[in-house]
Amino acid sequence: MNKTVKKIGKGVALTVAGVVGAVTAAVGGWIVFSRKYIQHDMPLDKALEAERQDFLSQHAGRISYYADRSSKGTPLVLLHSVNAAPSAYEMKPLFEHFRGQRPVFALDLPGFGFSERSDRLYSPLLYQNAISDFLKAVIGKPADVVALSLSCEFAALAATHEPELFRSLVMISPTGFNPPRMDKMASRAKARGSRSKLYAGLAVPVWNRPFYDLVSSRPSIQYFLNQSFEGLVPEHFVDYAYQTAHQPGAQYAPTYFLSGKLFTPAVRETVYQALDRPVLVIYDRDPYTNFEMLPALLRECDNWIGARISPTKGLPHWEAPQRVFKTLTDFWSEL
């Protein structure tokens, strides 16, 4: 009996050792492949066919933005989402539709696109300051701001601290409306330092870029975009996301995002409810966030309006553009 147990134990140990060895070899092989064969300085085209300029933010460094100043009126400022491979390209349908009708601006947020991608601390405060600095220095008058997904939190932070910079705020598929049980889980994770530990693990130089290369591979980008589209993802959307993810320093900001450090705890109660500017939320279904608590906020806050554009999955301005354009125009016409 003892011999049998020993043989089984030895077999299990050898199997585990073999699996560990295979995994280690695979990881090591991918690290080598990433360093030697994946291009990290691809030519990067402009995200939009418009004038591109740089602005030096006191708090956030060099920020790239696209502008069409051919018409007068209330400035429209577009803020892309934050994920593994975002850029101003995400806001292209809105930029193209409203250009020529009013001044339109689309930013590459810090760490993305043509903006500065240095190895530094990326935080909600950094993005809040980047937005505020841009609105003060480049726009110079109250603007209509349209933000996508997590950037809604950054825009809301800026609007609560300096409301005079905003005429209105539009949130497309915003984060921050998870049910209380999920907020509590996130708060406990932060209290335990889980996010910091995850960031520390992901940011180890030897595998930080190789890990990001996995997340930003073409199949990975295609997969995640498929989750956000009702219908087919435009091929050029995938192409540009891949381009912008293969630039020097492209891994730094997404590492903070992937470790959960760019989300503001209890943003609904501490930030969203404090907004005093007109707010429009455009939403439907989204695989990456939850709108369970949105109806309650719409009931509580008279300055908030919700518009459900169905069927869409997170990028309604791509999936149902004409309906989104009309919803926006109707909202702004009432201001």
Listing of model-derived features with the role each one plays in the protein:
Residues 160, 169-208:
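Flexible "cap/lid" loop of the alpha/beta hydrolase fold
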Residues 274-312:
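Conserved loop-alpha-helix segment in the C-terminal half of the alpha/beta-hydrolase fold
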Residues 99-116:
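Conserved alpha/beta-hydrolase
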Residues 302-335:
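Catalytic active-site module of serine/aspartate enzymes centered on a nucleophile-bearing elbow/loop
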Residues 2-78, 99-102, 140-141, 333-335:
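Alpha/beta-hydrolase fold catalytic core
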Residues 125-143:
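Conserved acidic catalytic loop of the alpha/beta-hydrolase fold
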Residues 81-94:
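The serine-hydrolase catalytic nucleophile loop
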Residues 209-272:
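Conserved alpha/beta-hydrolase catalytic His-Asp/Glu region
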